[in-house]
A protein has these predicted regions:
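Rossmann-like NAD(P)(H) cofactor-binding subdomain of soluble oxidoreductases
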Residues: 71-136
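NAD(P)+-binding Rossmann beta1-loop-alpha1 motif at the extreme N-terminus of oxidoreductases
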Residues: 1-54, 59
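Internal alpha-helical scaffold of NAD(P)-dependent oxidoreductase catalytic cores
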Residues: 53-54, 112-125, 136-171
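Short, charged/polar "capping" segments at the starts of alpha-helices
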Residues: 34-39, 107-109, 153-157
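A structural signal for isolated positions on well-ordered beta-strands in alpha/beta enzyme cores
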Residues: 6, 28, 98-100, 123, ...
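Short, well-ordered coil/turn residues at beta-beta hairpins
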Residues: 65-69, 102-103, 149
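Structural motif
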Residues: 62-63, 98
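Alpha-helix C-terminal capping/helix-to-coil transition sites in glycosyltransferase folds
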Residues: 59-60, 143
């Protein structure tokens, strides 16, 4: 039996994360559109169902990859409200968990979120993606570097998730 992780969002980034980790982990996937990567083990359209299922699994790592859109506002700034909404929902659920944001966000955003969610059990870590939309799955599977930013011990837990799947890639 494999350890499991959860992936929120199944667009080209979330679908790539799902496919890229599927040989190493069971994947609990959530997307409100109902479209999922064929590599997902369990699929949910409701975040609360995803969390309930994930948290009840004996081998769940406590890691949620958040791969959601951050569209550009007219001001040129990223609109992080979709990501923040999901993080807020995750913070309202009991237990210790790590949210790994793969979305484009401005510098300092994870620090702001970690302050906001302090004491809830949720820690936010950033893991930028280096994917091209046309080859996203292959780009994810063939990474030449992995960058993780965030407080310990959460960033260490994310590092272990990547090390298991990509043991030869520098982190």
């Amino acid at each position: 039996m494999k350890l499991s992780i959860s992936v929120v969002g199944q667009g080209f980034v979330g679908g790539s994360v799902t496919a890229g980790f599927s040989k190493t982990y069971d994947i609990n996937a959530c997307d409100i559109s109902g479209k999922f990567s064929d590599s997902a083990t369990n699929c949910f359209v409701d975040l609360h169902e995803l969390v309930s299922n994930s948290e009840s699994q004996e081998l769940f790592t406590g890691v949620y990859f958040v791969c959601l859109p951050t569209p550009m506002r007219q001001s040129g700034m990223c609109d992080v409200s979709i990501v923040e909404s999901v993080l807020t929902q995750l913070s309202n659920i009991s237990g210790t968990r790590t949210a790994v944001v793969k979305s484009t966000i401005p510098p300092g955003t994870t620090a702001k979120w970690n302050e906001k969610f302090k004491g809830t059990g949720l820690t936010v870590v950033f893991n930028p993606e280096f994917l091209t939309e046309a080859n996203a799955v292959e780009d994810f599977k063939n990474q030449n570097r992995i960058i993780i930013g965030g407080p310990r011990p959460a960033s260490g837990a994310v590092k272990r998730v990547f090390e298991s799947a990509f043991p030869k890639v520098p982190i």
